[in-house]
Amino acid sequence: MKKSLIGFLCMLMLGCIFLTGCGMAGDDAVKSSGSSINNINGGVKDSSAPLGSKENPFKLGVSPMSGWYAWYGVKGAGIFEKNGVYVELKFFPVYSDSLSAFYSHQLDGICIAASDAVAPTNNNIDFKMVLVNDNSYGADGLVVHDGITSVKDLKGKTVATELGTLEHMFLLKILEDNGMTIHDVNFVNMTINDAGPAFIAGKVDAAVLWEPTLSMALQGGGKLLYSTKQTPGLIPDTLAVHNDIIANNPKLVQGIVDSWFDGVALLQAKDPTFMQAIYTGAELSEKDYDTMLEGVTIFDKAKNQATFAEGNDYVSLPYTVRKSAEFLKSVGMIDTIPANLQDILDDQFIKNAK
């Protein structure tokens, strides 16, 4: 717990990844546009071609989360191309691996939880969040076995989740809200993919999980003790893009943001082609994905414009980011609150969306 999140992220950047195996694919697999590959570069690309072209597509890192799976619908329905951009989706079973790839510029954009965007600003990692995909509303939760009826019952129990991730922060928040700290439980550092099966097998007493692993744990006999329904707005899932791309190719970023909003309209209408692309890309049944969607609030243009505005509650993304930074510092996960937090937010693309 005393290890800072900054140190953790630095190790990620240096390639010293000690977390493995989150998600639905093999530990080392990276799924690119529906196929499994072992090379993040996905084959030979024409680096002389403009970024976002067919010859040199924008590489977007996607991890297992309900809202982020909608990018498969955007891709499969041909929406990117309709907006004049080419995007290659890179699926990372291990969320922290996607962070490492993004920070080392192996990815052009990334699906990232807003809280995870705080610490890198202290290390001068240049990127901005340009879009909110969704807000967790039950898609993240604390599952327990029978006999545990309150958070205070976790005292002395084994609780598993992934160190340095938003689920780790969520666990700390749950404990804090109940007058406890991480030292009151036996914390077990596991990737989300490992924590779910460990919980189902009875190897740990509780686990903090995100979808789809959360649903798997509940189907495996777990009981939901606490979820983001009790802290709405705490965990926004966003799209982040490197600053140099924003500066040099704003039309590309605008095309991607426009594509998201086009996709949200099809998602809300349950367009068959769009939905089937999600089911295929995410390797989920229609029933399972529909259940997962109940745990998030998908953000369209209007919701994005509202959340990027200043406010004094978790409806506001700037407020949420500040509160996340304060919380991370209070529990020792970062040493200082970045002075330039506002600089990691860029609302020009949602304002200019068609």
Locate predicted features:
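Pocket-lining segment of extracytoplasmic ligand-binding domains
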Residues: 115-116, 187-188, 194-283
